[in-house]
């Protein structure tokens, strides 16, 4: 009887020993994976970084874009013609800025520069229109009758909106709605 008790205790000890060994190996694997994930997160990447904007929690914008009220804005540092600006914005899956609210105008007030925006004269409709074909708000913009129809529209806080030759090179703002 004493021999069977010793054998039973040895079997139980061996069973719990193997179980402990398995748990130690599993813990080691988890710790190793944890350090690997931390290293990946802290390693700089060559791909564009998506940053959630502090201003608005409903959108994420690419690096060098600014988030404001669920839209992303790219403010150029280089100058292009109106057409070149529009083409650049299109290549970024966006369009030239279409101002829709006074709040957006105040967002623009941080810069004194003149920027191309997305208003152009549509000869077929004999009207100034945004790129998407809608009319600019009369609350935000005065009459366009003072502008030459062969010119393009830009905006600056000091000049409000004004027209210039579309071939002039100016900075521009692209706007991208959330997808």
UniProtKB/Swiss-Prot annotation:
Covalent S-S links between cysteines: 58-70, 61-72, 89-174, 152-166
Residue numbers on the Cytoplasmic membrane side: 1-10
Glycosylation (residues): 93
Limits of the C-type lectin domain: 68-175
Topological category with respect to the lipid bilayer: Single-pass type II membrane protein
Subcellular location: Cell membrane
PANTHER family per UniProt: C-TYPE LECTIN PROTEINS, NATURAL KILLER CELLS ANTIGEN CD94
Quaternary structure annotation from Swiss-Prot or TrEMBL: Can form disulfide-bonded heterodimer with NKG2 family members KLRC1 and KLRC2. KLRD1-KLRC1 heterodimer interacts with peptide-bound MHC-E-B2M heterotrimeric complex. KLRD1 plays a prominent role in directly interacting with MHC-E. KLRD1-KLRC1 interacts with much higher affinity with peptide-bound MHC-E-B2M than KLRD1-KLRC2. Interacts with the adapter protein TYROBP/DAP12; this interaction is required for cell surface expression and cell activation.
Name of this protein: Natural killer cells antigen CD94
Record organism: Rattus norvegicus (Rat)
């Amino acid at each position: 009887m004493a021999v069977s008790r010793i054998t039973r205790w040895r079997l139980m000890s061996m069973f719990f020993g193997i179980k402990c060994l398995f748990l130690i190996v599993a813990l080691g694997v988890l710790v190793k994976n944890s350090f690997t994930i931390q290293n990946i997160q802290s390693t700089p990447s060559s791909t564009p970084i998506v940053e959630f904007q502090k201003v608005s929690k409903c959108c994420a914008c690419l690096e060098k874009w600014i988030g404001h009220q669920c839209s992303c804005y790219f403010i150029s540092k280089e100058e292009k013609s109106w057409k070149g600006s529009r083409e650049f914005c299109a290549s970024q899956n966006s369009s030239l800025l279409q101002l829709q609210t006074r709040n957006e105008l105040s967002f623009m007030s941080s810069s004194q520069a003149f920027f191309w925006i997305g208003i152009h004269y549509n000869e077929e409709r004999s009207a100034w229109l945004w790129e998407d074909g809608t009319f600019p708000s009369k609350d935000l913009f005065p009459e366009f009758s003072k502008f030459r129809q062969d010119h393009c529209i830009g905006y600056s806080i000091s000049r409000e909106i004004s027209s210039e030759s579309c071939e002039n090179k100016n900075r521009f703002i692209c706007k991208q709605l959330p997808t």
